[in-house]
Amino acid sequence: MRLTRRAALILGALAPLPLRAETREKLLLVLPPEDVAPHDPGPGAYDRPERLAAVRRALARSEFVTAARAETPKASLHALLAVHDSTYIERLRAASPSESVMRLGPDVVMSRGTFDAALHAAGGAVLAADAVMQGRARSAFVATRPPGHHALPDEAMGFCFFNNAAIAARHALALDAERVAILDFDAHHGNGVQRIFWSEKRVLYASTHQMPLFPGTGAISEQGEHGNIVNAPLAKGDGGEVFAAAWRERIFPALEAFAPDLLILCAGFDGHRHDSLAGLRLEGQDFRALTLRLRDFAEKRCNGRIVSLLEGGYRPEDLEACVPAHVGALADA
């Protein structure tokens, strides 16, 4: 099924990157425009607009005043089709309600602004990957909302509509990246990313996540067609020491052997001890410590190239603490 002409026009094209071509910014912060209609699933939703407001407050802190900033453009149709089926994209567009909300599944709700918000999230991921791969920024953090790592090529799930990390990785591979590592520290396993790249030897997907927990994937035995999937499940109640050990003992050795040209982080903060959607016991300092180690790896092995994409984290108070801990480590602030 082909997209209608109107849908293609709505999807638009990526805007030019507003960075100085002759410089390499230390840190790029990418946020959706203030005037974009919000993705608002309604009262009681976990992924509510207050999450993005908390991230905006966190990134307005004085330590980030020198960071380069850009607004998310809408993702191009070409970028979306690198991961998602055209029939699925059209189905999402057609399902967009003009008012109130539309429930597509038990954990997927669309409001009037959802489709545009999802386009901006995916477009921000592509913009950041482009900036980092083209040498205009060393690292980038994108306030991607709605999140993306559960989204399948033809199905929305787990609050996710477009798979932002997968779209960014495909874009990087289309440039001059030979190998891309997608590293996921969300409390929930990124089943969408894993499925998309199960048979892709140029992409390593590695994840720590709580098990058992939604979506039910992410066992150690799930290793991909080329051994390019590394899962390190955590148990309910695990804290910073177990989290750090899983990265040190399982993921970093695989990362060293893979030798990526770019790191894409699925930065989920729902492992924080106060988050009710999981049962891990992490603190802001645990996310900072991991980010510092990832930054050091990137400096030594891939010219510092990191693109970090917001995934989970459902208490605005926790996001306001964890996001600056993570982004500050990216920027060495």
Please report, for each region that a protein language model flagged, where it lies by residue.
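A charged, well-structured terminal subsegment
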Residues: 329-333
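Short glycine-rich phosphate-binding loop at a beta-alpha junction
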Residues: 69-70, 261-266, 307
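Metal-dependent C-N hydrolase catalytic cores
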Residues: 24-169, 176
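A short helix->loop->beta-strand "cap" motif at the edges of active sites that frequently abuts
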Residues: 301-305
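Conserved alpha-helical scaffold segments that buttress catalytic/binding sites
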Residues: 41, 126, 130, 141-300, ...
